[in-house]
Amino acid sequence: MLAEAVEHLIKNIVDFPDDVSVKSHENNRGELLRVRVNPEDIGRVIGRGGRTANAIRTVVQALADHKVRVDIMDVR
Protein backbone atom coordinates (compact mmCIF):
# COMPACT_ATOMS: atom_id res chain seq x y z
CA MET A 1 0.00 0.00 0.00
CA LEU A 2 2.79 2.46 0.85
CA ALA A 3 4.59 1.91 -2.45
CA GLU A 4 1.42 2.66 -4.41
CA ALA A 5 0.74 5.79 -2.35
CA VAL A 6 4.28 7.11 -2.87
CA GLU A 7 4.15 6.32 -6.58
CA HIS A 8 0.84 8.18 -6.96
CA LEU A 9 2.18 11.16 -5.01
CA ILE A 10 5.40 11.43 -7.01
CA LYS A 11 3.78 10.86 -10.41
CA ASN A 12 1.72 13.99 -9.79
CA ILE A 13 4.75 16.25 -9.26
CA VAL A 14 7.11 15.09 -12.06
CA ASP A 15 7.24 15.89 -15.77
CA PHE A 16 7.88 12.25 -16.77
CA PRO A 17 5.40 10.15 -14.74
CA ASP A 18 5.99 7.04 -16.88
CA ASP A 19 9.58 6.87 -15.59
CA VAL A 20 8.55 6.71 -11.92
CA SER A 21 8.91 3.36 -10.18
CA VAL A 22 8.71 2.49 -6.51
CA LYS A 23 9.97 -0.84 -5.16
CA SER A 24 9.59 -2.03 -1.60
CA HIS A 25 12.29 -4.06 0.17
CA GLU A 26 12.29 -5.49 3.69
CA ASN A 27 15.50 -5.63 5.69
CA ASN A 28 16.53 -5.79 9.33
CA ARG A 29 16.16 -2.00 9.68
CA GLY A 30 12.54 -1.98 8.46
CA GLU A 31 10.98 -1.32 5.09
CA LEU A 32 12.86 0.50 2.34
CA LEU A 33 11.07 2.20 -0.54
CA ARG A 34 13.34 2.81 -3.53
CA VAL A 35 11.97 5.57 -5.74
CA ARG A 36 13.41 5.95 -9.24
CA VAL A 37 12.62 8.96 -11.40
CA ASN A 38 13.84 10.47 -14.65
CA PRO A 39 17.13 12.40 -14.18
CA GLU A 40 15.38 15.60 -15.27
CA ASP A 41 12.85 15.20 -12.42
CA ILE A 42 15.25 14.50 -9.57
CA GLY A 43 15.47 18.16 -8.58
CA ARG A 44 11.70 18.50 -8.57
CA VAL A 45 11.29 15.44 -6.33
CA ILE A 46 14.02 16.45 -3.89
CA GLY A 47 13.06 20.12 -3.84
CA ARG A 48 14.96 23.15 -2.62
CA GLY A 49 16.97 22.14 0.40
CA GLY A 50 15.33 18.72 0.38
CA ARG A 51 11.95 20.10 1.43
CA THR A 52 9.87 18.02 -0.98
CA ALA A 53 11.74 14.81 -0.17
CA ASN A 54 11.29 15.46 3.56
CA ALA A 55 7.59 16.12 3.04
CA ILE A 56 7.24 12.82 1.15
CA ARG A 57 9.05 11.00 3.97
CA THR A 58 6.78 12.65 6.55
CA VAL A 59 3.65 11.54 4.68
CA VAL A 60 4.99 7.99 4.40
CA GLN A 61 5.74 7.82 8.13
CA ALA A 62 2.25 9.11 8.89
CA LEU A 63 0.70 6.35 6.74
CA ALA A 64 2.93 3.57 8.05
CA ASP A 65 2.65 1.65 11.27
CA HIS A 66 6.34 0.69 11.20
CA LYS A 67 9.75 2.16 10.31
CA VAL A 68 10.00 3.07 6.62
CA ARG A 69 12.90 4.67 4.76
CA VAL A 70 12.50 6.36 1.38
CA ASP A 71 15.47 6.53 -1.00
CA ILE A 72 15.10 8.75 -4.07
CA MET A 73 17.37 8.09 -7.03
CA ASP A 74 17.41 8.83 -10.74
CA VAL A 75 17.22 6.28 -13.54
CA ARG A 76 20.47 6.11 -15.46
Residue ranges: model-predicted function:
Residues 1-44, 53-76:
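RNA-contacting regions in translation and RNA-metabolism proteins
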